[in-house]
């Protein structure tokens, strides 16, 4: 998959996954995702 930096595009893709890659600074959840197995 590819990373999108356009806010409106986040809705088009998977909100959960796209957000995690596009907004790593959004919340601590991003850190958890990196350590958690898919």
Curated annotation (Swiss-Prot):
Keywords, in A-Z order: Bait region, Disulfide bond, Protease inhibitor, Secreted, Serine protease inhibitor, Thioester bond
Keyword flag Ribosomal protein: no
Gene Ontology molecular functions: serine-type endopeptidase inhibitor activity
InterPro entries in the record: MacrogloblnA2_CS (IPR019742)
GO CC, any one term: extracellular region
Quaternary assembly: Homodimer; disulfide-linked.
Record-stated family: Belongs to the protease inhibitor I39 (alpha-2-macroglobulin) family.
Protein name: Alpha-2-macroglobulin homolog
């Amino acid at each position: 998959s590819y990373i999108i930096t356009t806010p409106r595009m986040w809705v088009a893709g998977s909100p959960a996954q796209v957000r995690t890659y596009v907004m790593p600074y959004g919340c601590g959840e991003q850190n958890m995702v990196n350590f958690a197995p898919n």
